[in-house]
């Protein structure tokens, strides 16, 4: 059985749980500029953390709000430009007006472009390359609204417009990471589980206390809530999660980090792997035969554990790994450092691989409405 996290919106479309969040500050998103931020700074819009409310807090400009809020009486509309933390194909947006009740904007729209030259705000605001990917849409009072994006292209920046003014707590963009693999040095080890490279947690036995995707986020965890933690297991068995690697790779080194988990870390862990060629139905990976690559190994609290000489059966490429923890507990980060299989045509095929990732990913017919 797979248990739901209490912090996840049960009404959210499936791209929220099945895709990477490309925009937040946690993955490197940056607000480059905006038309106005009188009441609350635009950087709040891409905070990884959920918005909070403080009824008693006021600042020099007025009521403190955990979001982006502009002045009243704009004769036109406000907008901001944000650089995605991870370039990719966007499948949907989440616009959250939490705690903005009488001051939310009635409508919003979004445009996007792709520019890897790292342009500045002034260049971007004058650009003619913006493409509408979300038409002007209705927002609501203190609620989350979800909007599907049907433009199957790689983007690096978005322009978020609100009409005419007001406050939005958070903006999320969910999609598929598209990485340029030609930039990888031959022989270099790459963390193929990392979200910034295109790794994704696909299945989990339980993530009651922490979002499952925390485990593949950049950097070390900042606190216990910034990891993956399961409930106390009262019956037999153990907890686990599966990660779809960014691409097939030969596992060379593994890191399991229990940072901040001191009285609630797993006593041990093991890791299995599988290649999708032997498991055609990725939605039922648990039903297929997995290869053990890390035998059951003891863990300690609040520590980084590195495994290299302990690895077994790791002489061939895999596409998915499964982290088993015994019996339950918390892990903050998982790193699966791999070498890429040798291929004479590897560089020539990279563009084709990226195109395939774009066209075959998360089809509209597979999305929840």
From Swiss-Prot:
Cross-referenced SUPFAM superfamilies: Galactose-binding domain-like
Any one of the GO BP annotations: allantoin catabolic process
Keywords assigned: Hydrolase, Purine metabolism
EC number: 3.5.3.4
Keyword check for Magnesium: no
Single Gene Ontology MF annotation: allantoicase activity
Its job: Utilization of purines as secondary nitrogen sources, when primary sources are limiting.
Name under which the protein is recorded: Allantoicase
Originating species: Dictyostelium discoideum (Social amoeba)
Source organism phylogeny: Eukaryota, Amoebozoa, Evosea, Eumycetozoa, Dictyostelia
């Amino acid at each position: 059985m797979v248990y739901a996290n209490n912090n996840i919106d049960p009404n959210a479309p499936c791209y929220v749980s099945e895709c990477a969040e490309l925009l937040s500050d946690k993955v490197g998103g940056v607000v480059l500029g905006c038309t106005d931020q009188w009441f609350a700074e635009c950087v709040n819009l891409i905070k990884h953390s959920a918005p909070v409310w403080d009824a008693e807090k006021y600042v020099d400009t007025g009521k403190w709000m955990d979001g982006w809020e502009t002045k009243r009486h704009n004769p036109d509309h406000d907008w901001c430009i944000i650089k995605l933390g991870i370039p990719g194909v966007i499948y949907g947006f989440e616009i959250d007006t939490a705690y903005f009740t009488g001051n939310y904007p009635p409508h919003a729209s979004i445009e996007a472009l792709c520019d890897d030259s790292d342009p500045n705000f002034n260049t971007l605001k004058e650009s003619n390359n913006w493409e509408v990917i979300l038409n002007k849409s209705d927002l609501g009072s203190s609620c989350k609204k979800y909007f599907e994006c049907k433009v199957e292209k790689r983007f690096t920046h978005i322009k978020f417009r609100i009409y005419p003014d007001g406050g939005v707590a958070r903006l999320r963009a969910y999609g598929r990471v598209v990485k340029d693999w030609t930039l990888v040095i031959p022989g270099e080890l790459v963390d193929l589980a990392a979200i910034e490279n295109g790794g994704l947690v696909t299945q989990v036995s339980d993530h009651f206390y922490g979002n499952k995707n925390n485990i593949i986020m950049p950097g070390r965890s900042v606190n216990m809530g910034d990891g993956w933690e399961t409930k106390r297991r009262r019956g037999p068995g153990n907890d686990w999660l599966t990660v779809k690697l960014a691409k097939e790779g030969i596992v060379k080194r593994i890191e399991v980090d229990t940072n901040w988990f001191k009285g609630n870390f797993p006593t041990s862990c093991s890791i299995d792997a599988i290649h999708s060629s032997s498991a055609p139905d990725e939605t039922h990976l648990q039903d297929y035969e997995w290869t053990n690559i890390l035998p059951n190994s003891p863990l300690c609290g609040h520590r980084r554990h590195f495994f290299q000489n302990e690895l077994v059966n790791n002489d061939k490429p895999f596409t998915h790994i499964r982290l088993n923890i015994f019996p339950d507990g918390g892990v903050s980060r998982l790193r699966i450092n791999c070498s890429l299989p040798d291929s004479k045509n590897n560089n020539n095929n990279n563009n084709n691989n990226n195109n395939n990732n774009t066209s075959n990913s998360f089809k509209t017919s597979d999305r929840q409405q």
